[in-house]
């Protein structure tokens, strides 16, 4: 009896894992089709055109009609798009993005926006051959090798939190720091692992007198951060530097040192935390969100 029960339990465990991995594989392919629609502007085209045929979406997005039709049909079967007239000929069916899903794909400042996360998933898979080689050799895979999808995916995934929460909830929850950021003389903030700069920009927008210095080791991220801050009109108060957060020669005195969604990515996190502590002015604080 014990052996039969054990066998039944093993079968249940096996079947559960088979089902889970099968669903994960289908989900991975679905992510790829969503990535395709995002990168080609197909969701945007649907949003602007309303119910539209494959040829109309193809013209709006600048792609071939056959590929537009295949993508639209797949998205409808996946339950992402709706079909207004399913009985029509394949070339005449009109597709639309349900209003309930608009936030997920198009509203980049919304906390429900998932385009960044899905782009990150695709980007993280690109250097798998290099990751396999690193396992064999003990080497590493430099962050730039993960490419633009990883970099911009992370930025787009984190941006809504900074836009909606950083200046209105997170920092005000630290009453003493919130007061210091509004006081004279103007406070100084160091934003460690700033990436493309959205956290630094959010701090500067929330506290109009502070100066923010962002630090990141990735050249491409800092270049984008500088473009972002110029577009935000805050270049006079927000500056960015290509520096290693774990470098003991990183010095300064700051009223607030922040690290948002970055400690888990730093090769030497303990050293980075030590440097962050050393950057504090008297009465300053370190804020880590990870």
Report the location of each language-model feature.
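Alpha-helix C-caps/helix-loop-beta hinges
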Residues: 49, 77-78, 283
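Conserved beta-strand signature within the Rossmann-like core of class I S-adenosyl-L-methionine
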Residues: 283-290
């Amino acid at each position: 009896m014990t052996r039969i029960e054990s066998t039944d339990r093993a079968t249940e465990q096996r079947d559960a894992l088979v089902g889970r991995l099968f669903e994960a594989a289908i989900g991975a392919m679905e992510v790829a089709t969503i990535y395709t629609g995002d990168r080609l502007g197909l969701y945007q085209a649907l949003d602007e055109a309303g119910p539209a045929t494959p040829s109309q979406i193809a013209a709006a997005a600048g792609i071939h009609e056959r590929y537009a039709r295949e993508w639209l049909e797949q998205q409808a079967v996946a339950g992402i798009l709706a079909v207004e007239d399913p009985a029509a000929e394949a070339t005449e069916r009109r597709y639309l993005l349900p209003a309930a899903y608009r936030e997920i794909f198009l509203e980049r400042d919304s906390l429900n926006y998932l385009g960044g996360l899905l782009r990150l998933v695709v980007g993280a898979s690109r250097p798998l051959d290099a990751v396999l080689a690193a396992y064999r050799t003990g080497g590493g895979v430099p962050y730039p090798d993960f490419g633009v999808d990883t970099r911009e995916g992370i930025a787009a995934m984190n941006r809504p939190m900074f836009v909606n929460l950083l200046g209105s909830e997170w920092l005000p929850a630290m009453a003493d720091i919130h007061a210091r950021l509004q006081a004279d003389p103007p406070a100084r903030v160091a934003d460690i692992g700033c990436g493309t700069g959205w956290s630094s920009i959010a701090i500067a927008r929330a506290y109009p007198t502070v100066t923010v210095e962002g630090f990141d080791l990735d050249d491409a991220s800092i270049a984008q951060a500088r473009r972002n801050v110029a577009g935000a009109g805050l270049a006079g108060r927000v500056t960015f530097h290509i520096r290693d957060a774990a470098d003991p020669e990183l010095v300064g005195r700051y009223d607030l040192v922040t690290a948002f969604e970055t400690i888990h990515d730093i090769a030497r996190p303990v050293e980075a935390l030590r440097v962050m502590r050393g950057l504090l002015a008297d009465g300053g604080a370190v804020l880590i969100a990870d």
